[in-house]
Regions:
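Catalytic-loop region of hydrolases
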Residues: 41-138, 403
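Short, surface-exposed "cap/lid" segments of acyl-processing enzymes
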Residues: 119-128, 132-180
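Short alpha-helix in the alpha/beta-hydrolase fold that links the catalytic acid
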Residues: 129, 251, 377-379, 391-401
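Alpha/beta-hydrolase active-site loop
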Residues: 206-228
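Primarily recognizes the serine-hydrolase "nucleophile elbow" in alpha/beta-hydrolase
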Residues: 222-290
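Accessory cap/linker subdomain of secreted extracellular hydrolases
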Residues: 270-372
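C-terminal catalytic histidine-bearing segment of alpha/beta-hydrolase fold enzymes
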Residues: 353, 357, 362-363, 389-444
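Short beta-strand/loop motif that positions the catalytic acidic residue
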Residues: 375, 380-387
Length: 444
């Protein structure tokens, strides 16, 4: 495991990577050309300031246009996510609905999408997400596709990242990937985003259900390939953070059998929820465990309803069963204080038994932990030394396991990075690693 320096955030939000350092050595001394050399310092400063203001005006204008587009799109947002009448296509990855977005990042086009996938029982389901592609010509064999797995945002349909006012802000490294010429697709995962005509969740909740999340990611790539301007090829980079790290790892494991036409060129994860047994065991008696459990146990009880004993009354206390529906309806980022206010009294009173040892929960946690199958691609794993949710020791154990079964792993530890910042702070190292394993597509 390599320890690297922390990434230095630039002027942009953490959804965008730092700027590349200038190449070609130290700057050359300025040349003196004719009358330019006689300009006074004041005139030079005025020229520079005027130029800077002009650039700023362009950037501000572009941002105002983007925000205006976001505002317009919110008006008809709910209608887009209503599941259409009729049967869901049985072919996984079928694009069912798309809508070009107005408020897009500079130098790109984007679409909101609904597409078909498959749940754990093999039934066709609808999933939502977004696709972003840089301006410019794609290679003859199509663009590399970066499939992003988002960290926990909640489980209610309203918590889907693509439904947010700015659906791009949470995609860590999006600007970096667009500049590399990649198409970027970000799934919401099954159970989020899409609703019935009555406004309730369409499809089973799938929080931390690894195989279902994997299918959501892989099928998002297939859907992106059906939008002609995206010009998406078959080469795929999987990149995920926390819950999304688990999704990316499972997608890499399942791709050979579920989506054999796709080539997984590289897999990158930041503080992945790779070992659910250790994750849950580390937080049984704190607010993180209660919050994660309020999302995970209802999802498992719904998805594994046919498994004997996999009902909430077998694992949660009566007090927890009373409060979990309310917690389960709240989104993590927008309702964190409320979630903690509800969950705090449940600390130490949340579960009847230790789910890491009590069946069938112990088996379900193991089955949804990554590492059960190999990955036929190089693997990048980033971990923050100050992460108090996914513990550094647990990630180190996962890395050791992957290396023991012959997987090529590049593991880095970022000093001082927390669980919330590790995906962003690892971007400089991730870019260097991608340079070695996945070529750029030219960029905008």
């Amino acid at each position: 495991c390599r320890t690297v320096g922390r990434g230095k955030p630039g002027a942009e939000t953490p959804a965008n990577p730092p700027q590349k350092p200038a190449r070609g050595g130290p700057p050359k001394p300025p040349r003196t050309l004719g009358r330019a050399a006689s300009r006074s310092p004041k005139r030079i400063v005025a020229f520079v300031v005027t130029g800077a203001l002009a650039v700023a005006a362009v950037l501000i204008g572009a941002e105002v246009l983007r925000v205006s587009g976001d505002t317009i799109e919110q008006g008809d947002l709910a209608a887009f996510y209503v599941q259409p009448d009729g049967d869901v296509p049985t072919e996984p990855g079928t694009l069912v609905r798309s809508e070009q977005l107005l408020g897009t990042p500079i130098g790109s086009q984007a679409w909101r999408i609904l597409y078909s996938s498959t749940d754990l029982d093999g039934a066709p389901v609808l999933v939502s997400g977004v696709v972003i592609v840089p301006d410019g010509k794609a290679p003859a064999d199509g663009r590399t596709v970066l499939a992003w797995g988002h960290p926990t945002t909640g489980t209610d349909p309203s918590c889907a990242p693509s439904r947010a006012f700015d659906p791009f802000i949470g995609i860590e490294g999006m600007r970096l990937m667009l500049d590399r010429g990649y198409a970027v697709v970000a799934t919401d995962y099954l159970g989020m985003g899409v609703t019935t005509a009555e406004g309730v969740q369409a499809g089973k909740d799938s929080y931390l259900v690894g195989e279902t999340a994997a299918r959501s990611m892989l099928d998002s790539v297939r859907a992106a390939q059906q939008i002609d301007p995206v010009e998406a090829g078959d080469d795929v980079v999987l990149w995920g953070h926390s819950q999304g790290g688990q999704a990316a790892l499972f997608a890499a494991q399942e791709a050979p059998s579920y989506a054999p036409e796709l080539t997984i060129a590289a897999v990158a994860v930041a503080a992945p929820a790779a070992d659910l047994t250790k994750l849950m065991g580390s937080h049984l008696d704190d607010i993180s465990g209660v919050t994660i459990g309020s999302y995970a146990f209802p999802a498992f009880a719904e998805v594994y309803a046919s498994v004997p004993g996999a009902d909430l009354s077998s694992i949660l206390t009566p007090a927890a069963i009373e409060k979990v529906p309310q917690m389960n309806s709240l989104c993590l980022m927008s309702s964190l204080t409320e979630l903690h206010d509800i969950g705090q009294p449940l600390i130490g009173e949340f579960t009847l038994h230790d789910p890491t040892t009590a069946e069938p929960w112990a088996t379900l946690l193991r089955d949804n932990s990554a590492g059960g199958k190999g990955i036929d691609a190089p693997l990048f794993v980033a971990q923050g030394s100050a992460d108090e949710l996914v513990l550094p020791a647990d990630t180190a154990a996962f890395v050791a396991h992957e290396e023991s079964i012959g997987i090529e792993v590049h593991a880095v530890t970022v000093p001082g990075a927390s669980h919330g910042t590790i995906a962003y702070e690892s971007l400089p190292e991730l870019e260097r690693w991608l340079e070695q394993h996945v070529p750029t597509n030219g960029g905008p």
